[in-house]
């Protein structure tokens, strides 16, 4: 079940915003599970969220990637709804239905979401930008995060590379001349699948982000020294060929910075936006990780 979003844009602005339609279409196109909508008040404004699975099951918070809508990220991990109560808030400042601007720090916002739902603590999954948000939450309130799964994660630095140049140049060109071939050229280094195999709603959403603003060049996450206070058992899943957070380098940084790292899995051949096979493998590794923490 989804709510009528005709009266509100994805970012809390006017209803004419194209993200409103893109959000609904992503729910319809990408999610095979039933979801329900909720809104809660936080210090960062009103936060919209999707929930799925049995409310009596153990809660798992899913924190969205950047430059895409929440249901796109949720689709990666939706299979977990058979065992967990998935809670997926729209991050303020990202395409979605939450109001408010990007908060100065994400940790208090995550705590506000938990408080608004009456959840004392929860396991959490963060993808890309969402992993940086999760790390901030774990440092801000370590008692609220029981386990952390960080997938193609921000928070461990981004090295300069020619792959990033291959993304940046056509992205800038696309803003001036919004042609499909430029968009596909910009996204090719990020996606494991060829552009022809990517769901159209994902391409349209990122294209709209580029037309509205630049792709996020800065990612959340605490300073490395602050991670010494991160208490939750952590799983890291990387893509071997991820241009933003390369697999081997990210695993090395995670091992250095995260005192509670349980495992770092690198998916061979995967880039930043995982293929369906990569998404499935990441989800099943997260399932076994969460089961291990529950025992």
Where are these predicted regions, by residue range?
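Flexible "cap/lid" loop of the alpha/beta hydrolase fold
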Residues: 135, 139, 147-175
């Amino acid at each position: 079940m989804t709510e009528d979003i005709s009266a509100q844009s994805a970012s809390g602005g006017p209803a004419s915003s194209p993200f409103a339609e893109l959000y609904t279409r992503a729910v319809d196109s990408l999610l095979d599970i039933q979801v329900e909508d909720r809104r809660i008040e936080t210090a960062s404004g009103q936060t919209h969220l999707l929930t799925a699975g049995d409310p009596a099951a153990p809660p798992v918070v899913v924190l969205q990637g950047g430059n895409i809508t929440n249901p796109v990220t949720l689709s990666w991990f939706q299979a977990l709804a058979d065992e967990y109560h998935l809670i997926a808030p729209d991050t303020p400042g990202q395409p979605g239905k939450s109001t408010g601007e990007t908060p100065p720090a994400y940790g208090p916002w995550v705590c506000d979401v938990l408080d608004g739902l009456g959840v004392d603590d929860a396991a959490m999954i963060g993808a890309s930008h969402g992993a940086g948000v999760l790390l901030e939450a774990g440092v801000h309130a370590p008692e609220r995060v029981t386990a952390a799964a960080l997938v193609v994660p921000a928070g461990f630095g981004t090295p300069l590379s020619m792959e990033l140049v291959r993304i940046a140049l056509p992205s800038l060109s696309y803003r001036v001349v919004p042609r499909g071939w430029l968009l596909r050229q910009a996204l090719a280094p990020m996606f494991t699948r060829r552009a022809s195999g990517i769901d159209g709603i994902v391409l349209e959403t990122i294209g709209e982000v580029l037309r509205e603003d630049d792709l996020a060049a800065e990612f959340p996450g605490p300073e490395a020294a602050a991670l010494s206070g991160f208490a939750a058992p952590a799983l890291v899943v990387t893509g071997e060929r991820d241009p933003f957070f390369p697999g081997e380098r990210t695993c090395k940084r995670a091992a250095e910075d995260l005192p509670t790292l349980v495992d770092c899995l690198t998916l061979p051949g995967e880039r930043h936006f995982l293929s369906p096979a990569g998404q499935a493998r990441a989800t099943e590794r997260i399932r076994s990780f969460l089961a291990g923490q529950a025992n």
